[in-house]
């Protein structure tokens, strides 16, 4: 599709067909479009607002172009779109250790920051984790720690063509929405946080279109892309071909309604400090938000468990020291694997 025709169509607020969307995403991901053309496309899509069909088509192209990794099943991913502008610490990354410590295999898909102060990769590198691992090394992490981090640039090399445009735009774009939809381990269960409740049903429907077995798509009424400790959060759950909407408040599960001030960070260093305090068993708002969001993943991963029981499993994973042990064990394992590969 010629860029001029594409831009005219989007300027007139006309949605793209699935075929058109696949063609355009392919052009963005193969260097056919320039940085200016990619940025223009992303900005116009944001103004028009992306549809279920457009996102499904885009995700299919991204999945086709990805370097896939087979880590077996069942697996879960806990991921947010980002773009909420709130600069909270890396909650979903912290939850990954808790959920893995609860005995659930986690394939955490993440990247460096584009629009926030600390992406999951920024935080993990600050903590000393090695992210550039081979497929067999990633499998080793899953086998030994129940958890592996899938560094997006390694699995989505085509994304390099859009990186400059995204960075120069500096705003939330289509790719924030796509990130949670293109886990290279092809997970069938996911907790996905979105930056606005307007996107809940859309993202849940796209996940269903892409073959998800079960998903929870979450947004809080104060604009977080996760379950909040400062407001009610809305959930759209997809399971067995059906969608269900429900709400979560911290008070419903014996947790305090708290200000977000205590969980805002300015850097990966601050985010790491908060995560380590939570995993060490410290109480407070950071622990509470990790409990709530870890519970969402446990609830999504395990059939027949209540949300109350999921909160308790998350609490035990932290207070037993297992989550902290998982953090330290995985960090050491990634360092050891990296040294071994460097000596080969």
From Swiss-Prot:
Mg(2+) 2 binds at residues 225-226. Signal peptide: none annotated. Disulfide bonds: none annotated. GO terms for molecular function: anthranilate phosphoribosyltransferase activity; magnesium ion binding. Its cofactor is Mg(2+). Mg(2+) 1 binds at residues 92, 226. Anthranilate 1 binds at residues 80, 111. It catalyses: N-(5-phospho-beta-D-ribosyl)anthranilate + diphosphate = 5-phospho-alpha-D-ribose 1-diphosphate + anthranilate. Binds 2 magnesium ions per monomer. Belongs to the anthranilate phosphoribosyltransferase family. Catalyzes the transfer of the phosphoribosyl group of 5-phosphorylribose-1-pyrophosphate (PRPP) to anthranilate to yield N-(5'-phosphoribosyl)-anthranilate (PRA). This is Anthranilate phosphoribosyltransferase. It comes from Legionella pneumophila (strain Corby). The gene is trpD.
